[in-house]
């Protein structure tokens, strides 16, 4: 039996972080957490690309462009979609979630979903470092692990299958 998994060594990895300005009180804290996680685990400043966008819906376009460039080992998308009085919350939350899932099914580069979908600003702030940890930091850990898993799958599974069969 072969077990393949990633690890948390970020040295040499190139990571993009897409973060909206909308709900900046929350998203800036998510970004701080993500950058802290990446740097603590060895991803250097020169290998981190932060892309600031207006809102979460613009992440879909931005993710597609970053995937087309193909220079990153993983991409993190952050955001905070907070329920309001209209149906807009549902549209934004559903569309960004569907887009990330679709890109993950069709791309070779892992995209990590770090978009908070909450009922209140307080819930969002709690998940951005106030009480419940920082989901940006957690997204950084997932990005590093998935980037390393991607490399290992190529090396340990693909190469051994193509050489051995």
From Swiss-Prot:
Task: Tell me which residues this entry annotates as catalytic.
Answer: 88
Question: What Enzyme Commission number(s) appear in the record?
Answer: 2.5.1.78
Q: Is the keyword Calcium assigned to this protein? A: no
Its function, per the record, reads: Catalyzes the formation of 6,7-dimethyl-8-ribityllumazine by condensation of 5-amino-6-(D-ribitylamino)uracil with 3,4-dihydroxy-2-butanone 4-phosphate. This is the penultimate step in the biosynthesis of riboflavin.
Q: Where does (2S)-2-hydroxy-3-oxobutyl phosphate bind?
A: 85-86, 127
Q: Which GO terms describe its molecular function?
A: 6,7-dimethyl-8-ribityllumazine synthase activity
User: Which species does this protein come from?
Assistant: Thermotoga maritima (strain ATCC 43589 / DSM 3109 / JCM 10099 / NBRC 100826 / MSB8)
Organism classification: Bacteria, Thermotogati, Thermotogota, Thermotogae, Thermotogales
Q: What protein family does this chain belong to?
A: Belongs to the DMRL synthase family.
Pfam families, alphabetically? DMRL_synthase
- GO cellular component, as recorded: cytoplasm; cytosol; riboflavin synthase complex
Q: Which residues bind 5-amino-6-(D-ribitylamino)uracil?
A: 22, 56-58, 80-82, 113
Q: Does the keyword Cell wall biogenesis/degradation apply?
A: no
**Protein name stated in the entry:** 6,7-dimethyl-8-ribityllumazine synthase
Alphabetically ordered keywords of this record: Riboflavin biosynthesis, Transferase
GO biological process assignments = riboflavin biosynthetic process
Its pathway? Cofactor biosynthesis; riboflavin biosynthesis; riboflavin from 2-hydroxy-3-oxobutyl phosphate and 5-amino-6-(D-ribitylamino)uracil: step 1/2
Which reaction does this chain catalyze? (2S)-2-hydroxy-3-oxobutyl phosphate + 5-amino-6-(D-ribitylamino)uracil = 6,7-dimethyl-8-(1-D-ribityl)lumazine + phosphate + 2 H2O + H(+)
Top EC class for this record? transferase
